[in-house]
Amino acid sequence: MEKRIAVIGIIIENMQSVEKLNSLLHEFADIIVGRMGLPYRERNLSIVSLAVDAPQDVISELTGNIGKIDGISVKTAYSNKIFND
């Protein structure tokens, strides 16, 4: 199975959406290598970065679902290297 490493950048502008986001991330916990969250109180938003290791379609499924949550923006950067596990 071909896997990719990716970094997912998430900006949370609606704090009421955090519970939905955390629930979704829990569903995909097995592909998350690391997570860093930064509250930016001066701007009333939070920034989350995820490092993931999974097939590209699974990463796309996760980011697509994140993008459907109200008040959340998401972008993904993929590594060029493909791993065959």
Where are the predicted features?
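Long, contiguous binding/interaction regions
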Residues: M1-D85
